[in-house]
Amino acid sequence: MIKSSLLLAFILGSLNLFAANPKVLLKTNMGDITLELDEKKAPITVKNFLAYVKKGHYEGTIFHRVIDNFMIQGGGMDKDMKARPSSKAIKNEAFNGLVNEAGTVAMARTSDPHSATAQFFINVNNNSFLNHKAKTASGYGYAVFGRVIKGMTVVNRIKKVKTHNSGYHSNVPVSNIIIKKAVKL
């Protein structure tokens, strides 16, 4: 009885080790982007992102900041450049060992290291200057929590769109790039 209980506990524990990382499909008006999220290295950030996906927050938001050779940012503004309400800010997990390289997804934030809510960005270049250096306001970095596993050609098309200034915002695409749907796969 004890042996079979131990064996069952071992098998169930082993299954957890090989559990697949969560994946999210972003359906945009320029094509689909599939993200794989690193739940082990960024558990707080992944839980936060998936909560926004589950409640439909990203549907109808746009990539509102696009800078070729840097990143594409979205998840917080609607097509009229109005901010979507967001939940409480989360702890910055930029010290997790993941780095801001091309194809990774990270949380956008203000100058406060622990101010990330819903906005995220996809790096289109290796942006090592965004990596964690120290647990200080200027050295904290931006928390990477996943990567693009399908649809990098879509990301590369988005990074090339024409942009302009819109009110207080710069690098805003002239034509809206809309996240039509975000679903956990």
Give the positions of each predicted feature.
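Hydrophobic h-region of N-terminal signal peptides that target proteins for export
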Residues: 9-18
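Bacterial N-terminal signal peptides that target proteins for export
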Residues: 1-6
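Cyclophilin-like peptidyl-prolyl cis-trans isomerases
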Residues: 17-185
